[in-house]
Each structure stands twice: as C-alpha cells, then as structure tokens.
C-alpha cells in the first residue's frame, strides 16, 4: 500500500493528501474491505512525515466511515464503506480544489467559470 503513495509539496496539507490517496485506493478497490493498513508509525517512517500527520489522516478516514480502528489490532478498511458523500465532504473537496488552483496560479473566478462550463451552465 505504501508504494502507491506520492506526497507532493503543492500547498495541500500532507494529511489531506494522505487521506485522499487512501480513500481513492479504497474507492478503486486497491484496498479491499477488511484489509489491514500499515500502522501509523510505519506510514510516518516510510514517508518521512510526522506521526501526528498520519494520525490526523487516519482519524478523518475513520470519521468518514472509510476506516475502522481497533485498539491493539490496527486500522482496517471498513467492511461497508460510506455510500454517499456528505455536504461537508463536498465543501472540503471544493476547498482542496481551490487551494490547488491557487497554488497553480489559477484565479478562483476562472476555476468557477470552468466548472460551470463543465456542468453545462454558462
């Protein structure tokens, strides 16, 4: 699982990148329901990041119903992943896209216009 993680210095917090990459791996079926994830310490050491960063990513994944953490046993992909994104997830996703756009030098009004065109509303 660790070999597929690629963290970048792109203005997006590391815990967000880690959380999103794990969630995407679950969504694509790379991490199957019930699969055990590496320990937080293993992830922190392998990626040369702070343990608190990994803890925050795992905690948010658990909050979102993607992971289940069992004290003394480890972290596992939830047997029944969440079905629909919540409104808070949509806002968070939009905030991440906005941060990426700004880091790339794209004005937010340009981004909004491009999204409207993609949605078929000009």
In which residue ranges do the predicted regions lie?
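Short secondary-structure transition/capping segments
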Residues: 46-47, 82, 121-122
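The DNA-recognition helices of helix-turn-helix-type DNA-binding domains
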Residues: 61, 84, 118
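Extreme N-terminal segment that seeds HTH/winged-HTH DNA-binding domains in transcriptional regulators
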Residues: 1-36, 42, 88-122
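Terminal helix-turn-helix DNA-binding modules in bacterial transcription factors
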Residues: 80-84, 89
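N-terminal helix-turn-helix
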Residues: 36-67
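Conserved beta-strand edge residues that scaffold enzyme active sites
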Residues: 74-75, 115
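Beta-hairpin "wing" of winged helix-turn-helix
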Residues: 30-35, 60-72, 78-79
């Amino acid at each position: 699982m660790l070999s597929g993680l690629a963290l970048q210095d792109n203005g997006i917090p590391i815990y967000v990148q880690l959380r999103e990459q794990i969630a995407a791996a679950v969504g694509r079926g790379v991490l199957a329901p019930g699969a055990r994830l590496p320990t937080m310490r293993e992830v922190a050491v392998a990626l040369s990041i702070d343990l608190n960063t990994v803890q925050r990513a795992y905690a948010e994944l658990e909050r979102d119903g993607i992971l289940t953490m069992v004290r003394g046993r480890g972290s596992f992909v939830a047997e029944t992943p969440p079905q629909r994104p919540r409104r808070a997830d949509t806002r968070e996703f939009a905030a991440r896209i906005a941060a990426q756009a700004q880091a790339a030098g794209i004005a937010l009004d340009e981004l909004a216009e491009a999204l409207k065109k993609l949605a078929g509303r000009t």
